[in-house]
Amino acid sequence: DIQDIAAEMRKVKKGDTPFQERRAIAYAIAMIEKKVGAKLGIKDRAGMEFGGTGDPTQQDCVDEATNTTSYLLILQSHGLLKYHTVGIPMTKGDLLKATLQGDPVKYWPHWTAVIQETKTGQRFAVDSWIYANGENPAVVEVEKWYIKDIDNLPKATN
């Protein structure tokens, strides 16, 4: 399977740059999610669907951040990351604002996996929770990730 993932990463890269590696990472994460989802019966729908509470096929952002971090560590351990290292998952959110505005979901803390560009130190969120299982995650600078609220999350990396 790792050979298939490496081949997919090579196929989607349009050059040997950190940006193209992030693009390839997005495709690799989507590919791994499809394979793992099929084996485990995960049919994760996009984003927060509270109707999915108790549904074992639905994951929250903590599950997604944990799984994506694990997948990134696999890519790293197999030498598939040249320009990035795997970082510690991070969270952003504002519980006080959620409480004061009476909308706990909109401003709830949200988790993501993180990669760090080795040359610049720039950290990037790798957020697979936003999209359905097997779709490309958003890979975006952490400063631009989840800056306003849950309705303004970044687009998928294609």
What is each model feature region?
Residues 1, 60, 97-99:
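Proteins with a high burden of low-complexity, intrinsically disordered sequence enriched in S/T/G/P/A and R
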Residues 1-16, 45-54:
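Acidic/histidine-rich, surface-exposed loop or edge segments in extracytoplasmic proteins
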Residues 2-5, 25, 29-32, 42, ...:
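Weak global preference for isoleucine
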Residues 11, 16-18, 95, 105:
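Mixed-charge, polar/low-complexity N-terminal
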Residues 20, 24-85:
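Mid-length scaffold segments of soluble, non-membrane domains
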Residues 67, 133-136, 152, 158:
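Detector for Asparagine
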Residues 73-145:
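Hydrophobic/aromatic-rich core segments of domains that either
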Residues 142-158:
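Low-complexity, Gly/Ser/Thr/Pro-rich intrinsically disordered linker/tail segments
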